[in-house]
Amino acid sequence: MPRDPLIGIVGKPSSGKSTTLNSLTDAGAAVGAFPFTTIEPNQATGYLQVECACSRFGKEDLCKPNYGWCSKGKRHIPIKLLDVAGLVPGAHSGRGLGNKFLDDLRHADALIHVVDVSGTTDAEGKNTRGYDPLNDIEWLQDEIRLWVEGNLKKRWGSIVRKHTATKSSIVDTLQAQFGGYGSHAPMIQKALDRLKGLPPLEKWDDEWITRVVKSFMMEKFPTVLALNKIDHPDADKNVSKIMLKYPDTKAVLTSAVTEVFLRKLKKQGFILYEEGTEFVDTFEDEPDKLKPLDDKILNRIENIRDLVLYRFGSTGVVQVLQAATDILGLIPVYTVKNIQTFTGGNGTNVFRDCFLVKRGTPVGKVARYIMGGEVTIASIETVGGVRVSEESLVEPGKNDILGFKIAPRSA
């Protein structure tokens, strides 16, 4: 059974990494047990917001997930987050908590790199003015590359000799070296396919080793940039520089401290706030539902509206987790016992169970993942009781609501 996806949160000190993590993990609602068997000390549970299947069928009032929650058709799905500590220049050589940083990193399926785009903290998180946050993006990539590359080069002579003696494929040889980072053969093949004119492994020089490692990093460590502190006056110019330098990298503009502030006021009953949107209502808008705020807080909310919400459409926190799961190709799949009513059995609650699955996964593989390998699947059905083959693929809005019929055990 595949393990749950794990999103690593990285960032230098004072970048807003801890605040971002807090904003992603704040439940904001009474939530039941987690679906995960273990949560390590440096792991947390975040909540991915998606359009729930209940909204397709007008069943929002009946949607009661077993894990997470659903509000007005917005489902919040639990997902594991990893707080990756120790990010400082020189981490690859063990500086700071470098060894722990790199050991944590290899467990992550994707990274959210929190970048302070205000330019008010230097490479080590100390207060300054006019710092270029492009440096932070570059040295994170350099630290990972130097770590992987250094481990490879230390053994390169023996790697080449064994590769030649055993007549192994490049994929098999690299998998033997990269397996400790959580790689698998298809991942390595995809990384190699990106490289044009790749010579035989025994002819690789330092430049080719670097190119291979960089391509491997794109597969193993896909990264979303959380460009944080967007309400600072210097943020605009720094965001523009980053977008120009990294046009193909997924980037989301965020203000994590704003998100945490708004959620706190919402919990205390001072505002109505819909996460992931620009909408904030106060006592002046809803006097029957909300408590009044003092002028100082009201002025801060007005500034938040002007500098963040109306300008960017949201604080970006909901969107950054969506972007991380998107680069992994993960989509929600709903499993039900009754494909006609979408319930879990005899009750009236719908779409109780939801799993994150890679887009394009065969339906039969999903069935074995959910039901376990010890049962025999007699048939698989989707909306309307339509039978689907095990080879049919899961796609957004297609084969993403499934019911499994189990074959009776033979005597």
Swiss-Prot record:
Binding site for GTP: 11-18, 83-87
Top-level taxonomic group: Eukaryota
Start and end residues of each OBG-type G domain: 5-274
Name of the protein: Uncharacterized GTP-binding protein YGR210C
Signal peptide: none
GO annotations of cellular component type: cytoplasm
InterPro entries xref list: Beta-grasp_dom_sf (IPR012675), G_OBG (IPR031167), GTP-bd (IPR006073), P-loop_NTPase (IPR027417), YGR210-like_G4 (IPR013646)
UniProt-listed PANTHER family: OBG GTPASE FAMILY (PTHR23305), OBG-TYPE G DOMAIN-CONTAINING PROTEIN (PTHR23305:SF1)
Keywords linked to the UniProt accession: GTP-binding, Nucleotide-binding
Nucleotide-binding is among the record's keywords: yes
Gene3D superfamilies listed in its UniProt record: 1.10.8.470, 3.10.20.30, P-loop containing nucleotide triphosphate hydrolases (3.40.50.300)
One GO MF term attached to the UniProt entry: ATP hydrolysis activity
Chain ranges passing through the membrane: none
Originating species: Saccharomyces cerevisiae (strain ATCC 204508 / S288c) (Baker's yeast)
Other noteworthy facts: Present with 11600 molecules/cell in log phase SD medium.
